[in-house]
Amino acid sequence: MGHKLKLRLLDDKFVISKMPQFAELPSVFAKGEMCFVMRTDEDLTIISPEFMAPNNVQQEIGFRCLRTDSEMPMNSVGIVDSLIQSLSTAGIGVSVVSTYNIVYLFLSEEHLVKATQALQHAGHEFVHEE
């Protein structure tokens, strides 16, 4: 039986930006807002709220973010799979980023309602800010 998780929809809309491998990281990313930065041997990828997105770079726009609402140990088994299976079955693509103990799912805003329904149907629960 899969994990049943509590999820939260973040308010911001997100952009996934691709920059050259050795590009300088724009200074806006030192300001403390949530963002994800990954430099590889191929590129520099940044996932950020729209208002922080760098200009004049390759981008995918219109993403929303769902996150797990509670911390999970790094060695938890099946957490991501329990989320991805529901979305995959519904035909929804997703990009997953994990921090030390939180999972973030980035999906196209046009699929947000369908994704929410699929995750709820699988037994996951959505919580809201108080």
Q: Which functions belong to the PLM regions below?
A:
Residues 76-110:
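A structural feature that tracks compact, well-ordered secondary-structure segments
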Residues 7-8, 109-113:
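Non-transmembrane, interaction-prone segments in cytosolic or luminal domains
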Residues 106, 114, 120:
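Acidic/glycine-rich phosphate/pyrophosphate-binding loops and surrounding catalytic core
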Residues 1-86, 90, 117-130:
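Regulatory modules associated with amino-acid/nitrogen control
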